[in-house]
Amino acid sequence: MPSHSLAFDHVHVISKDPHATAAWYVEKLGGHVVKSTVVLGAPQVYVSFGGPMVIVRGQRSAELAADKPGLQWGVDHFGLKVQGDFDGFCAGLRSQGVAFSMEPTDANPTTRIAFIHAPDGVSVELLNRKDQ
């Protein structure tokens, strides 16, 4: 029997403006800021969606950040499950000026998905599973 277990905890986003980015996740997607602090010299804001969190931090003094165009190896996006009226939720985001990289579509007979652009080049998948 293993002496440990694992559970998903967070997605970590590095942002040019962590407080504005955290506010975007709150205002557009309904997250809640549960903590705002400084870690290793950079502001860090914890945004909860009722489970694993999005942690948004700023640039540390010794770091150099750069924008990354195009497809990159590694993490591509993170997904948020939408319960309820998926198309209505997406329409509400669109009315707030949120840009979609993929419009709502049926991924399979039981799942609708869409992709939106979040601050700092982050891609967020929205999904609604009819069987859950």
Where are these regions (language model features)?
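Vicinal oxygen chelate
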Residues: 1-4, 7-16, 45-48, 66-132, ...
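Core segments of cupin and vicinal oxygen chelate
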Residues: 12-54
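Active-site/binding-pocket entry motifs
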Residues: 53-54, 61-62, 99, 132
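Generic preference for hydrophobic
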Residues: 54-56, 126
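A short, acidic/glycine-rich surface segment
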Residues: 61-67, 102, 109
